[in-house]
From Swiss-Prot:
Keywords: Cell junction, Coiled coil, Cytoplasm, Cytoskeleton. Essential for intermediate filament organization in intestinal cells, interacts with intermediate filament and regulates intestinal lumen morphology. Belongs to the UPF0184 (EST00098) family. InterPro entries: BBLN_eukaryota. PANTHER family: BUBLIN COILED-COIL PROTEIN (PTHR34344:SF1), UPF0184 PROTEIN C9ORF16 (PTHR34344). Pfam families: UPF0184. It comes from the Eukaryota. This is Bublin coiled-coil protein. It is found in: Cell junction; Cytoplasm, Cytoskeleton. Residues 63-96 are annotated as: Disordered. Residues 39-79 form a coiled coil. One of its GO terms (molecular function) is molecular adaptor activity. GO terms for cellular component: anchoring junction; cell junction; cytoplasm; cytoskeleton; subapical part of cell.
Length: 96
């Protein structure tokens, strides 16, 4: 018969699993301290990731707004005809 994951039932009595590892209180305390340090580092990484994610969203929104403004400016320039030339300015430009 198999276990919940499809693994065969294995008992300690079968001699396959040997649970002779016994840890002292100091070893448990050291492991606990290391896990706390790892957890603290992971929290710091998560905070930095959240900050970067926020900055990227701000940059993306700024980029979208700049593109929208640029497109609007191009559309405005295409919609309005170029200014009429002043005959006096044309005469001064052709003189050499």
């Amino acid at each position: 018969m198999s276990g919940p994951n499809g693994d065969p039932n294995i008992s300690v009595d079968d001699g396959i699993i040997e649970d002779e590892d016994e840890f002292s209180e100091e070893e448990y305390a050291a492991i606990d301290s290391m896990l706390d340090q790892i957890n603290s580092c992971l929290d710091d990484i998560e905070d930095r990731n959240d900050a970067l994610n926020g900055k990227l969203h701000e940059l993306l929104e700024s980029n979208r707004q700049a593109r929208k403004d640029f497109r609007q400016q191009l559309n405005d320039e295409e919609a309005s005809p170029p200014p009429a030339e002043d005959p006096a300015s044309r005469d001064t430009q052709t003189e050499d």
